[in-house]
């Protein structure tokens, strides 16, 4: 049914994915100086993040893999992978907020973090397109439900008196379902591809930034070692020469200098080391933010691939019911048989649509929790002011919540409004 109506499929993602893979392979060929495993061992917080990430990703991958084995991916798998995606996004927000002052001091890293959160705008567009598709699917579901109800609950006397009118009415409703076409339209797949391309682009930016940070960290470690050795050696040599000169000119002064000779060396060494350590700590903070965004983006790409497969699975169900409608168009006996087939498949279709709708609601609710934290992150107190993208995100999110009473009464929505109000006051 989907191919007959000319609905755009996300096949173009394959070429984009191949190009991105080739780019990543080229980057890998250069070799990354840093070791993620070593970083996890050295940094307890990063190790905890990695453990939680692996657990979430493993659960999502297992859910999808179990569906692949039986050639049937359920909406439960969709809930698992999208839940993993949004949990990862919240974790990234937590890491970024913890390092926000270091991020503000680095314009490049600030822009990178802002690009990452601007991806939430594309996610909102994707969820809005999904919501429209679900409304169309529910409308089609209602048409089929009415056709089945009329055919099976018509009084026997009325059915005998006007059988032809009954079949004509039923057939008309079945044709109305067929004419509605695919609920997943070009808009849905366009929004999907926009999110996917943005995530793939983010991967490239994060990898390049991480390599630069790795090189700087390696250099800073060498600087601390070499500068410490050279500086302290030179300082010690100066003290030795001073003591020698004093010994020649005034032996009692040399005797007094000898016990205190190590004190200035230690103080100077601590001073030099503290300067380099501050720089190294700042680089570590930057790298932690980049690593969190890099892992979150990678998981997002895998989850989007899984969502695409699950949407195609739902389309197969719709196409199967459309085939039953086509069969019912042959004659009155075929109408009766076609209605029975549609009734069998309608229950599964209704459950799939309802489950997908519930998942979309949960995704929106989680975004209600993520975006206020982003508002606090891009706080005008940092001197950069509020960007147009932030206002756009706030307005888009407000419009989505305003249209649904469930969101308007949720504490997430109220939290978002409170955060937005504080930002507007700060700007004014």
From Swiss-Prot:
Belongs to the UPF0496 family. The keyword Membrane applies. InterPro entries: DUF677. It comes from Oryza sativa subsp. indica. It is found in: Membrane. One of its GO terms (cellular component) is membrane. The chain crosses the membrane at residues 229-249, 252-272. The keyword Mitochondrion does not apply. Residues 22-31 have a biased composition (Acidic residues). Residues 1-14 have a biased composition (Basic residues). It comes from the Eukaryota. This is Putative UPF0496 protein 5. Keywords: Membrane, Transmembrane, Transmembrane helix. It is a multi-pass membrane protein. Residues 1-40 are annotated as: Disordered. The lineage of its organism: Eukaryota, Viridiplantae, Streptophyta, Embryophyta, Tracheophyta.
